[in-house]
Design a protein with these regions (language model features):
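Extreme N-terminal cap/leader segments of soluble proteins
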Residues: 1-63, 82, 91, 106-115, ...
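General beta-strand structural signal in soluble alpha/beta enzymes
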Residues: 27-28, 46-48, 121-125, 163-164, ...
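Acidic, Ser/Thr/Pro-rich beta/coil linker or hinge segments at domain junctions
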Residues: 3, 260-296
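Active-site-proximal betaalpha loop/short-helix elements
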Residues: 98, 176-243
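Small-aliphatic-rich amphipathic alpha-helix that forms the alpha element of a beta-alpha
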Residues: 64-88, 109-117, 205-211
């Protein structure tokens, strides 16, 4: 059955009753606006929106459940980069009228599965038809304690640069199945002083310079130390993108303890020092090939 045969109201009737609601949801999906009761003790409200567009972030032949998973996890990876806890999500789906209803159902199943992984309540959204490709926008709201918020703009000269996991070759499978490093980020900010952090969505060659520019510093990188996925080369680690790992800067005074504690807490996930932040006037980093840049 096509979407044009089912119609918006009947489609929403099929989808909305399955969406996960937490105890803090007062009025959820289906109303004009969602109403939530934020938990006490959180200092900052955190908001993020992200999109997934057919032909850019996924191909139509991709498994719809995997596409739904990725669409939800993309903004959650940004929450990991700020050490924030996601709690509510809004979904906007734009699809051609000829889209199979079964595809949409599987897509929403992927959304629900990803949301449940981090106890996120899907509280509403919007649907619309289009003559173009399928596109989805996911907006997420959450919270973070004031003393645990991390941005990309507070890196300091002399900081060590670390990256979680392994880089390169994500397009083969990982980009549809990754899990944001929220648990790892929360552990880091609870136990260590993290000066700056960013998630590697567009590639190390794009995201590392972004962090350095935001912090008004330069960087030097040890290419031989980059942790590579199986079959990936240094160029892949720098340029492929879609890794969704964390890149962060912290004081070298805590590096030994950080690495030792990390291995004990996350023995199956590598943490690698790949370089350091230096004064802008002393930049010695190679000209990194860029990752993915929209509109170019």
């Amino acid at each position: 059955m096509k979407l044009r045969q089912l119609g918006e109201d009947r489609l929403l009737d099929q989808l909305l009753h399955r969406l996960p609601f937490g105890k803090t949801v007062v009025v959820g999906a289906g109303a004009d606006c969602a109403l939530v009761a934020p938990p006490a003790g959180r200092n900052f409200l955190v908001l993020k929106t992200d999109c997934a567009v057919e032909g850019i972030h996924f191909l139509r032949r991709a498994n719809a459940l995997d596409v739904g998973w990725k669409a939800m996890m993309r903004p959650l990876s940004d929450f990991a980069a700020t050490s924030a806890l996601p709690q509510f999500a809004l979904i906007t789906l734009i699809a051609p009228k000829e889209t199979e209803v079964g595809w949409v159902r599987e897509f929403y199943r992927g959304l629900r599965k990803a949301a449940a992984r981090f106890k996120v309540s899907i509280v509403g959204g919007e649907t619309s038809s289009t003559r173009g490709p399928i596109a989805v926008s996911v907006s997420v709201v959450g919270f973070v304690e004031k003393n645990r918020w991390v941005s990309r703009c507070s890196g300091k000269v002399g900081d060590d640069l670390f990256v979680t996991g392994q880089l390169g070759g994500a397009i083969k499978r990982k980009h549809l199945h990754f899990v944001p490093r929220i648990a790892e980020s929360r552990w880091l900010t609870k136990n260590f002083s993290i000066h700056a952090m960013i998630d590697l969505s567009d590639g190390l060659g794009i995201d590392l310079p972004r962090l350095a520019r935001a912090s008004k510093v330069g960087f030097e990188i040890e290419l031989e130390n980059l942790p590579l996925n199986r079959g990936a080369k240094i160029g892949n680690a720098i340029s492929d993108g879609e890794d969704y790992e964390l890149l962060f800067a912290s004081s070298p005074r805590q590096s030994k303890r950080l690495l030792r504690s990390w291995r004990q807490k996350f023995p199956r996930l590598p943490l690698t020092r790949i370089g350091s932040l230096i004064p802008q006037s002393a930049v010695r980093n190679p000209q990194l090939p860029g990752g993915y840049v929209h509109f170019q």
